[in-house]
Amino acid sequence: MIIKARHHWFFYWFFRKYSNWLPRLDFREIVLHTQLEDKGLPVLMIGNHFSWWDGFLAEYVNRRLFDRKYHVMMLEEQLRTRMFLNKTGAYSIRKGDRSMLETFRYSAELLGDPRNVVVMFPQGLIHSQHDHQIVFERGWYRMMDKVENPVQM
């Protein structure tokens, strides 16, 4: 059984504010160069996982470009040690377990609602940003077979 996202109004509100404020402390400037347009579809954000900043920066991009309800897939063992993240939109995946199928079904369900953004880091673990080869875990793309509507990626 997976741990589903349970947005709590205060934790989610705080996370959104914190994700907007925190990068400004450590980065001189954040510039989004994009010609991406919001098509009004649910959004799937896929990225390489190179730092603990990734989730915050994904929410920062979400706020600037899409302003959807944030959901992020996390390894269950990491989520269990930081359960407050569940209240900000984190849900679990357990690598190598049959419950992965349930996680993919849940992700597809989230992507059925155009008000949602789903963030995933298919590398599984944090890797150096200097790695020249980015390798995603196998199977994550099967989730898309379960999505019945168009999705913006």
Model feature map: region roles:
Residues 1-26, 80-88:
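Alpha-helical membrane-targeting segments
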Residues 25-153:
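Soluble catalytic domains of membrane acyltransferases
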